[in-house]
């Protein structure tokens, strides 16, 4: 049985603009999870963890990526390989598995593993937001770094890190040693994608970049202009690879959306990393 416990009645409703939404909240292992269904005729849900938006899932069309940073992640994937070509993907951090569903819908032959530390959250998502049964998509309830450290070399085309605990990525997933391990797990032309929440002067991003620039040959940063110019807090997506990233293609793709993304190349990423050094496992970043 799912370990989730509803704490708000399933028919509780709230008005949001001209829409009426259905809210249902649950206690899970690491947070209070709230599912918000838009009453638009579609089976579209937003997952909030402790009141913060975590994932958006449209069960009728998993190709719809409503959160801009998740769309940028999908954009990078779509620039890496022709439509339909499998991209075996390891997801460090699960949420409602928006990106994994997108990959399953657009590249159904891809093998994917989603690692989520919160077992009750996985139960909730499996029950309330079910995905099409397939052996190509597996969930593992475990510590993401521990799974990464046990993954065989060259097992994946893509590794995606989108894991947060108390508003921050776990330290064990931010270290130089973690980046080195990701590089080992990736195939030679593989790509590591990292979601960072930050604002100017980009201290968190600088630490991430210091590690990734030391490990990978090419690194780029994607965000919206208002964030990059220091006007507000927001998401930054970092792409790192030993292959040359298709910067021009990614730039065109991320600029074509509701919120136009901008790409900073390796040279600009290096400038963002100045004054920062990589975190090490010995400093408290080990999965232990």
Show where each model-derived region lies.
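SAM/dcSAM-binding transferase cores
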Residues: 2-38, 54-60, 229-288
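The AdoMet/dcAdoMet-binding core of the Class I SAM-like
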Residues: 41, 60-184, 188, 203, ...
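A generic structural signal for alpha->beta connector loops
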Residues: 109-111, 134-136, 189, 216-218, ...
């Amino acid at each position: 049985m799912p370990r989730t416990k509803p704490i708000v009645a399933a028919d509780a409703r709230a008005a949001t603009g001209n829409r009426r939404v259905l809210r249902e909240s649950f206690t899970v292992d690491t947070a209070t999870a709230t599912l918000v269904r838009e009453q638009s005729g579609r089976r579209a849900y937003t997952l909030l963890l402790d009141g913060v938006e975590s994932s958006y899932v449209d069960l009728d069309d998993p190709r719809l990526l409503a959160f801009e940073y998740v769309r940028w992640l999908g954009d990078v994937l779509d620039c890496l390989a022709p439509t339909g070509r499998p991209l075996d993907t390891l997801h460090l951090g699960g949420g409602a598995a928006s990106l994994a569903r997108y990959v399953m819908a657009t590249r159904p032959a891809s093998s994917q593993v989603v690692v989520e530390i919160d077992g009750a959250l996985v139960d909730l998502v499996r029950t309330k937001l079910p995905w099409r049964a397939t052996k190509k998509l597996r969930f593992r309830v475990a510590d993401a770094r521990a799974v990464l450290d046990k993954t065989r070399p060259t097992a994946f085309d893509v590794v995606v890190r989108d894991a947060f605990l108390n508003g921050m990525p776990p330290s064990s997933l931010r270290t130089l040693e973690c980046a080195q391990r990701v590089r080992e797990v990736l195939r030679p032309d593989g790509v590591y994608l990292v979601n960072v929440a930050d604002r100017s002067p980009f201290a968190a991003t600088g630490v991430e970049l210091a590690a990734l620039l030391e490990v990978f040959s090419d690194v780029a940063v994607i965000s919206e202009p208002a964030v990059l110019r220091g006007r507000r807090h927001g998401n930054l997506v970092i792409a790192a690879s030993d292959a040359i990233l298709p910067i021009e293609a990614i730039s065109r793709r991320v600029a074509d959306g509701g919120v136009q993304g901008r790409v900073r190349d390796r040279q600009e990423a290096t400038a963002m990393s100045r004054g920062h050094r990589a975190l090490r496992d010995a400093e408290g970043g080990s999965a232990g």
